[in-house]
Amino acid sequence: TVGSYWVYDWYTVDSAGNSTWDPNQTDSVYIAGDTIIGTDTFAIQVGTWFGGAFSPPFRNYLRNLNGDLVTPSGSIIFSATNYTDTFYIWNPGNGQTMGYRKMIDIGEIVTVPVGTFRTLNAAFIVVNLVGTWSCFGIYDIHDNQYAENIGMVRTSFQFIGSCQALEGRLRTYYIAP
């Protein structure tokens, strides 16, 4: 809904699970409006990623299609109902890695600064096709955990050469009526 927003704080999590808040990395995401693409209405989502450190503010176009969050190209980035299919496959063509999006960890309880939620994880999983990574084995899992009627409450990613993960945790949000 136009006017809804979410604010995330970022944490560094070491291999033992200890987390450290980074006060210099905060993101906000909001619904700026909607637009028609083809014959479908999409929400315009605007925000920053990791405090803008990796990219300028982004603009996504998303819509709800029978419980799935989809892009204008039809890619599913989240599903509230389909826990078996692979939604997206990424292949850079280098023969070393590939990735895919899949719903995992259904019903996992997640605690973030704003509260505790039962979540669905629209994980992006990168697979090492030629060996293992020192900290992850063959799978590098990037979490995108969503709570019903809230949106994304936790996201995580890591760099291949590091045993630390970076986590965005929901600090506050507002869902416009």
Q: What is each residue range found by the language model?
A:
Residues 1-177:
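Conserved functional acidic sites
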